[in-house]
């Protein structure tokens, strides 16, 4: 049996974070959660996730800046990143893609099963 894929969930809404963490755990992932951009950066290096689910609007350091730093840090430059945010403007999606996001999902337009499906897709896991 292969080791569990590691997911770092970066979300400042505790209720949403708890729901996503529970579902991802049930799906068989090893999940770590943090609630702000500063903690995301240190946890990404320490935890060595296979994929990061990253909110955009967070305290301390926003998700776009976190993404930029991740892409310019040798230990995290190749980690898959899915931005999961309330920001729905095309310019926000373009900014995320330009900074190196692998995917961009708008919270109001997806349900948790959609997010799990995208995670599996980016990790090359069959349903």
Where are these predicted regions, by residue range?
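Active-site residues of response regulator receiver
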Residues: 55, 85
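Conserved acidic carboxylate
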Residues: 11
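Helix N-cap/capping motif at the beta->alpha junctions
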Residues: 33-42, 63
